[in-house]
Amino acid sequence: MPVVAITREMGSLGKDVARGVSEALGIPVIYHEIIDHLADRMRLRKSHVMRLLDGRAGILERMTADQTSLSIFAAEEIVNAALQGNGAVIRGWGATQLLRDMPSVVCVRVCAPFEVRKQRMLERLGTQDADKVAEEIRDNDEAHAAIMLRHFSIDYTDPEQYDLVLNTQRISVAECVDQVLRVVRSPEFAETEAARQRLQDLGLSCQVRAALRRSPRTRGMRVTVKVDQGRVSFDGAGYSAGERAALCEVAAGVPGVRETEDLMRTINLRARFA
């Protein structure tokens, strides 16, 4: 079950690489499906969701949207996509970072120099307005950088964040596809039982976080969720026994959860302010 997560820059031909990998492996490209599901869950327009995920939403859109819920639900949708069917090529918001620690998932960045991307976009759009196209590319790059920094605390251009970085200035789309296929088919990325379990645990942790966000009892709680072979543990501090019990009760209702464990710490306010 090959899973490839791809991030790209505007004008880098990343969409073409994703499509080529999809066709070669006989697996779908997942992007619009995630947007559709999020729009339904958040009761927002698809265009609104896309701008929020891309970091290009206006101030009014940001103020009227629950961005915390959006990021939690987006993570759930992305990891669920990786778990379903016979594999997938997943494009877009945070997929490379959410899945980068999964042993059998190949995380790819497709890039190209700014001037190369600008020329491609001029040709694609059939325009000679180089300044406008350059501004659009810069805005897109800056928005993507801000989103990745805000949600994952990383510089998305750092090659160490990926298994494979492809510069399409001199490497053709076909060669990029071949490079990805070689990595996907290499022994290092073979799907094992242990690798599958890691991905299932990640998926379950995302489902638990989403369930906690949906429940009025736990919606505002900020805790760390860890999953090991279906066993869910919570870590954090500052919550009452009733609130901690609610965490375990909500998590226990998520399919696949075998047991829950409360590792929360109690803050002794009297000692702290004595």
Residue ranges and their predicted role:
Residues 101, 112, 119-123, 129, ...:
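N-terminal targeting leaders
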Residues 24-30:
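Post-Walker A helix-loop "phosphate-sensing" segment adjacent to the P-loop in P-loop NTPases
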Residues 35-87, 127:
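ATP-dependent small-molecule kinase phosphotransfer cores
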Residues 5-19:
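Glycine-rich phosphate-binding P-loop
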Residues 69-73, 88-92, 146-150, 216:
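Short gly/ser/thr-rich secondary-structure transition/capping motifs
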Residues 88-125:
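ATP-dependent NMP and nucleoside kinases share a basic, alpha-helical "lid"
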Residues 1-4, 8, 86:
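Pre-Walker A (Motif I) flank of P-loop NTPase domains
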